[in-house]
Design a protein with these regions (language model features):
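Short, highly charged C-terminal tails/helix-capping segments
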Residues: 117-121
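Active-site beta-strand/loop architecture of penicillin-binding DD-peptidases
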Residues: 1-4, 10, 16-115
């Protein structure tokens, strides 16, 4: 496989191990993503804050206008050792970017496996 730009193997291992823990550690921000997966995956969650709750005096998230709700992000790749898919999901003023990614990766890997099995037959 051709490498587009050089990456220090130690740096790559540090980053990919940290991204695995986002999904596999009980303290990971995407722990629910990794439940019942049949593949290894690494990911990173992110939030872009659109408002300061105190500044606008909102008492609950439900009272915040949609245009001021946070943007949610999730980047991931799978399988970890030999990735065949990498993606970034951005949900404007919403949630569940990691849930969307899970559906996409599940389906992609299911189709990829089916195609591989057909080629082998």
């Amino acid at each position: 496989r051709q490498q587009i730009f050089p990456v220090d193997p130690d740096a790559w291992n540090t980053v990919s191990n940290a991204m695995q823990k986002v999904i596999s550690s009980p303290l990971g921000t995407a722990i629910h993503f990794g439940k019942n997966t049949h593949y290894t995956v690494a990911g990173k969650t992110g939030t872009v804050q659109m408002y300061a709750k105190r500044r606008f005096h909102y008492r609950s998230s439900k009272s915040i206008p949609k245009a001021l709700k946070n943007n949610h992000l999730f980047i991931s790749f799978a399988p970890i050792k030999h990735p065949t898919i990498a993606l970034a999901i951005v949900v404007e003023h919403g949630e569940d970017a990691d849930g969307i990614a899970r559906h996409i990766i599940d389906r992609y890997l299911q189709l990829h496996q089916s195609n591989s099995e057909r080629k082998a037959a």
